[in-house]
């Protein structure tokens, strides 16, 4: 599945290897545009990266794009639901609270929120979410009692000010000021053209002892090896860099960070999404499992099997996405 279209000399933007690297032709499949984009996989650090950045990325982030589409306030309109979510999400982020722990067993918190429980946070911690879209995760945190938080995303139409006080600002991380205890990238880092410059900004903004959390798809995975250019999380052309474990370590070292921990948190999406792409079914198709499960090519037994396989791959450090916890040296 991973036979390259050709080999071509390119300069790796991560490790600076100027060599002949395998090149892959990858189609846009979220919206079924089927445009082809060329990626190369560095022979040294193994980072898979787009060869040429498209001049206009706006057409690949239309209205209704995943991270912009949800108004998180709709989850908090019923008093009972609001209370349950607040208690659950406080436990999800901090890992503390018996009642929240009990609720979480029956009503699990989102994985991106639970990723924070490995960091020593308090509700007074200053948290910056970069590339947060409409700010759904931050909204959950704000409702759970975290008030020193800010979201930034250059792709939103305008600044967002929610009724509860949360602000999401239309800006780049390089424009942010102040100091922060946690700076996090939940599936946004792979969309950024200059990851080293981004980490340089993070380094300036982090408080001593602060943490940078990067949650991304990883090419060091079974899904890439098995599905190749049909791997759903390749997501051309929106994902500019699909990091390997080595390439992210190299990038971190360049800005004097070290990776303190890695947690694999992939799910069944890596299988049903990639199987759809193999069969020419886009993510937004009427036949897509995400749009219409009953009309998809999968039954529930298959989805359950995909889920179990994903959990095993995570245990084996072979899942197709992971959370990296970076600290300054």
Give residue ranges: language-model regions.
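Conserved N-terminal segment of class I S-adenosyl-L-methionine
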Residues: 1-186, 196-199, 264-265, 289-298, ...
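Short conserved AdoMet
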Residues: 122, 193, 207
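A short His-aromatic
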Residues: 187-191
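Short N-terminal helix/helix-N-cap motif within the alpha/beta-hydrolase-1
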Residues: 193-197, 224
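A short glycine-rich, Lys/Arg-flanked "PGG" loop and its adjoining helix->strand segment in the class I
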Residues: 196-213
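Short, glycine-/aromatic-enriched active-site segment of Class I SAM-dependent methyltransferases
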Residues: 212-241, 246-252, 277
């Amino acid at each position: 599945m991973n036979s390259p279209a050709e080999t071509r000399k390119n300069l790796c933007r991560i490790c600076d290897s100027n060599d002949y690297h395998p090149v892959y032709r990858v189609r846009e499949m979220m919206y079924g545009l089927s445009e082809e984009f060329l990626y190369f996989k560095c022979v040294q650090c193994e980072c898979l990266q787009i060869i040429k950045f498209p001049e206009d990325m706006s057409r690949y982030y239309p209205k209704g794009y995943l991270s912009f589409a949800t108004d998180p306030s709709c989850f908090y309109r019923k008093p009972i639901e609001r209370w349950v979510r607040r208690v659950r999400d406080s436990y999800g982020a901090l890992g503390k609270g018996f009642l929240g722990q009990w609720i979480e067993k029956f009503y699990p918190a989102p994985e991106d929120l639970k990723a924070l429980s490995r960091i020593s946070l308090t509700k007074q911690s200053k948290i910056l979410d970069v590339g947060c879209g409409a700010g759904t995760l931050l909204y959950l945190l704000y409702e759970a009692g975290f008030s020193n938080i800010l979201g930034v995303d250059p792709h939103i139409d305008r600044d967002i000010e929610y009724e509860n006080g949360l602000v999401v600002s239309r800006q780049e991380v390089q424009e942010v000021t102040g100091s922060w205890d946690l700076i996090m990238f939940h599936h946004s880092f792979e969309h950024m053209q200059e990851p080293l410059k981004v980490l340089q900004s993070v380094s300036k903004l982090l408080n001593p002892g602060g943490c940078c959390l990067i949650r991304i798809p990883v090419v060091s995975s079974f899904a890439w090896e098995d599905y190749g250019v049909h791997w759903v999380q390749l997501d051309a052309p929106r994902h500019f860099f699909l990091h390997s474990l080595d390439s992210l370590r190299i990038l971190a070292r360049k800005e004097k960070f070290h990776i303190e921990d890695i947690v694999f948190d992939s799910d069944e999406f890596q299988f049903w999404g990639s199987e759809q792409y193999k069969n020419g079914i886009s993510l937004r198709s009427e036949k897509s499992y995400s749009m219409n499960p009953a009309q998809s090519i999968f039954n529930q037994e298959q989805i359950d099997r995909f889920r179990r396989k994903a959990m095993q791959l995570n245990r084996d450090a072979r899942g197709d996405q992971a959370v990296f916890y970076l600290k300054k040296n």
